[in-house]
Structures are given as structure tokens and as C-alpha cells.
UniProtKB/Swiss-Prot annotation:
Domain of life: Bacteria
Cofactor names: pyridoxal 5'-phosphate
Encoding gene, per UniProt annotation: hemL
UniProt KW Transmembrane keyword: no
Keywords, sorted A to Z: Cytoplasm, Isomerase, Porphyrin biosynthesis, Pyridoxal phosphate
Cell compartment(s), UniProt: Cytoplasm
Class in the EC hierarchy, top level: isomerase
Involved pathway(s): Porphyrin-containing compound metabolism; protoporphyrin-IX biosynthesis; 5-aminolevulinate from L-glutamyl-tRNA(Glu): step 2/2
One cellular component (GO) term of this entry: cytoplasm
The protein's name: Glutamate-1-semialdehyde 2,1-aminomutase
Subcellular location, principal: cytoplasm
Modified positions (N6-(pyridoxal phosphate)lysine) in chain numbering: 267
Subunit annotation: Homodimer.
Originating organism: Flavobacterium johnsoniae (strain ATCC 17061 / DSM 2064 / JCM 8514 / BCRC 14874 / CCUG 350202 / NBRC 14942 / NCIMB 11054 / UW101)
One annotated GO molecular function: pyridoxal phosphate binding
Amino acid sequence: MLYKRSSQLFAEAEKVIPGGVNSPVRAFKAVGGTPIFVKSAKGAYLYDEDGNKLIDYINSWGPMVLGHAYQPVVDAVIEKAKLGTSFGMPTELETEIAALAVSMVPNIDKIRFVNSGTEACMSAIRLARGFTKRDKIIKFAGCYHGHSDSFLIQAGSGAVTFGSPNSPGVTEGTAKDTLLAKYNDLENVKTLIEANKGEIAAIIIEAVAGNMGCIPPAEGFLQGLRDLCTANGILLIFDEVMTGFRLARGGVQELYGIDADIVTFGKVIGGGLPVGAFAAREEIMNYLAPLGPVYQAGTLSGNPLAMAAGYAMLKALDNDREIFTRLEEKTAYLEAGIDRVLKANNVVFTINRVGSMISVHFDAGPVTDFKTAAKGDNETFKKFFHGLLQEGVYIAPSAYETWFITDALTYEDLDFTINAIDKVSKTF
């Protein structure tokens, strides 16, 4: 495939945008080459500025559960835009989508909409600190909760892709209030709690990690965190920016039967438009202004276009309960196919999967945390990425990202992908 137009556009972008992109991982620095500039997308496919058609396994980093340009979402946004794009005032639709979300997700009474997953996680931490009157938080190495200062301590996703999981600009004081734990290591968490008794406001976690590849929680790990939080007056925060409304109708709380105290959302809840949200039981949410002392605000929070897109998306997921079964079946089919061809070609690899989230690690594994995820062969991944791109399959340009499956994918698309992986892996 040729990417002449994308190369030209990237050169122009570099003149006026730092690094030529508005989010670092898009720049292809981890894999080399020139980033692909997208012109349009429909269903399971991307169409770039050079006219190439690509099967998409990024899906805007997760929210396109039903595929790109899903018609009910498109129609809802168009109709709402005709009535005005932003008011900075309450609208009826905000209440409707809030009620729908509360009905779908276990253990939440109220929800507050913001503009991104970063903002949702940042606000959730502030709320937890205000509610508990404590300052410290525990996060897990390799988990990514957005680019707020408190979270850029051994973060996953783009931060680790660029080799800088601890960002300059994060003050020493901020860093001291963020305690770092090992994912899937309950004893390590216990040690941190004992060493900081009565000081920890919250533990925040991607219950299924998606920013160091897809890493599932070990058996008993989430329940262990729940028990530790309950015993020590700590709030348990599930970051469901990737998993919410994707792995199950009610997210990971439903999937694993574990209740969080606060849940954060993004991506899916906006149908692809910029939206985030955080939710909890009433006594916690009532600490938010204007009811309580914890301040959080936003001019564009609950804006009508995002609410229209999100409501159409959640309605579709709520009405068709078989979507999650189809996603599971399609992703299991893809997993089996990848496993078969990589083994046949004598590739050293590990596949991790939970529902419609999947990742391929070029290491014998097991891959269970940040340390083991970092052992993957990045040179092999680069060959894998560019080989698939030439075959018309687009995965994330980073070895530390998850693939997201959409209901719009057909089994013919999956077979095409498996055959492409077979062809590419023969060249390793």
C-alpha cells in the first residue's frame, strides 16, 4: 500500500502541531514510519487519505463497539446539532442518559458527566479525597488513567510507549501522594496499606488492564482489593474507560461480581464523541458541588451532541443484549486463529484476552503485569505492525496497547486478519 498523501499531510502537520499529532502514540515513533491520516470510517473499516481500506482493530481506542458511523448515533448527532451545539445549561437529555446509565451499571445511584476519561478519573480522585479526608492514592504500574499529574507515575499506554512513564512537570509533592503497586500482587498492596495506615483515600485500577496490552485480573485479586478497601476505609475506584459498556452491559462490576465505590467511564459512553463520567452511590456523589464541598465543573460537560451520541449508543447496547455474546464469540474465534497460525510458524508469543479486548505479546509469558508486559520483543512487534498494515489490517502502533473488537466485524474480516497474520509471521 502507498501512503504518499499521509506522508505529505504529516509533514504539514509537523510545522504547526508538536510532533505532528495531538496524542503522542499516533506519531508512529514506537514502530517507525509515517502515521496514517484517516479520511473516513464506516463499520469495521478505515479509509485513509491515500484511498486505502483497512480493517480497524483500534476502533478509536475502544468506543466503536458497534462500528464506525453507526447510523443511530450519526442520526442523533445530526438532529441534535440542528437545535444547537452547546448551551452551558441543563438539558432533558442529560437526565435521560444518566438514568439509563444508572439502570445498566450495578452499585451506582448517581452519575456526573465530564468531557474525557482523564477528567473523569481526575475528578473521581478528588471526590475520594474529599469524602475520606485523606490524601494518598494507590495506582498500579502500567495502568493508565489519563494524563492528570497524579496518574503519570509509571503509567501505561502512550507514556510507556515513549519510555517516559514518569513525566517531567509532575511535582515531587504530587508524586509523593501517589503510591505505586504491582498489578495482580495483593501482598504488595497490603504492604503499602500497612505502611500508610489511615492515609490512603482510594485505590484506582483498570480492573482489566488495557494499557500494557490486555491483562486480566488474577483469580481473587479484585475481591482481595475489595476486602482490603472495606477493612481500611479506602474507596475502590474502577477505571472503566475502556471496559465500561464493552465487556458487559454493566461493565467489569457485572462481569466479575465485584462492587467498586466509584466507577469512571469514557469513550463508549459518548458514542465516540468527547465524553467522560464518574458514578457512585448517593452518599459519595452528594459530596459534589452544588450539594457538597468537593468542586467539579465544566462548560461543555453534558453538551447536547455528546449526550445525543451517548444515549443512542447506550440504548442500542441496552436493547440488544446479544451484542456482548457476539463480541465474545468473534473475539474467541480471532484468538483461536491467531494462536493457530503463530504456533504453526514457530513464533514465541502470548495472547491475553478478556471479552472483546485482546493483545498479542511477543514473549513466552505469562504476561500478568507491567514488568512482564515490558519483556515483549519490540523489534518483532514492529515487523508485525508494518506487515499487517501492508496487508490492510490496522492495529495500534504500540506493543503496549489492546486490540478492540467491534460487532461490525464479519467472520470474513476475521479470516482475512488471521490469514494476514499467517503471511506476516512467516517472515519473522
